[in-house]
Amino acid sequence: MSSDELKRQAAAAALEHVRDGMKLGLGTGSTAKHFVELLGERVRGGLNVVGVPTSEVTRADALRCGIALTTLDEVDRLDLTVDGADEINAALNLIKGGGGALLREKIVAAASDRMIVIADESKLVANLGRFPLPIEVNSFGLAATLRAIEEACAECGVFGPLSLRKGSDGHAFVTDGGHWIVDAQLGRIPDAPSLADQLNAIPGVVENGLFIGLASMAVLAGPNGIRIIERP
């Protein structure tokens, strides 16, 4: 079974938690796209929900699938967000942002009563950090911000090269919010909550891809079926 088929299975399992009338956060990435497509099928069958997309790509996908959209300016809270992840540990802390939407993803997740993370089981890891950690930064004063990121990482006992993410045109990748992304190849992050706090204390850092304490459940698909992990 292909990775893409497993992603779709995880998305289908998460869809079982959606109820009529819900306000949903719609994630970004290949697994979240499966969820949006499957949700669209349910909407066409009569399900009544509204969604808040976490990126312009997801917005376009949701509209194409016939899902009604709203914004966090128009609703106070969301009932549920369903999103993918680049890495998940047993405590349901995550690395996200491989698709470049980490800021909006974190804003939407924080505004939700529950967050379900969907992935194929290869994303479950003992320790976060093998996947490069995305850090969204302001373009102004980049060199100073990079030095501060290196210092923050060192204080948390993690080291590794930093690279500015490039787009397909060879120039700096620009997020929906107009920022740049630095990818930190750290290998292993022993204390993710501390590193997240240290990074977000840097003036040039807009947000980081460590999602701490936001996910309430992970739905993981593997060759032997669906595995559910709930936050302790």
Curated annotation (Swiss-Prot):
Positions annotated as active site in the UniProt record: 105
CDD domains: RPI_A
This protein's name: Ribose-5-phosphate isomerase A
UniProt keyword annotations, A-Z: Isomerase
Enzyme class: isomerase
One Gene Ontology biological process: pentose-phosphate shunt, non-oxidative branch
Keyword Isomerase recorded: yes
Keyword Transport attributed: no
Its job: Catalyzes the reversible conversion of ribose-5-phosphate to ribulose 5-phosphate.
InterPro entries: NagB/RpiA_transferase-like, Ribose-5P_isomerase, Ribose5P_isomerase_typA_subgr, Ribose5P_isomerase_type_A
Gene source species: Rhodopseudomonas palustris (strain BisB18)
Recorded GO MF terms: ribose-5-phosphate isomerase activity
UniProt pathway: Carbohydrate degradation; pentose phosphate pathway; D-ribose 5-phosphate from D-ribulose 5-phosphate (non-oxidative stage): step 1/1
Domain of life: Bacteria
Binding annotation for substrate: 28-31, 83-86, 96-99, 123
Documented EC number(s): 5.3.1.6
Assembly with partners or alone: Homodimer.
Family of the protein in this entry: Belongs to the ribose 5-phosphate isomerase family.
Pfam families per record: Rib_5-P_isom_A
Catalytic activities: aldehydo-D-ribose 5-phosphate = D-ribulose 5-phosphate
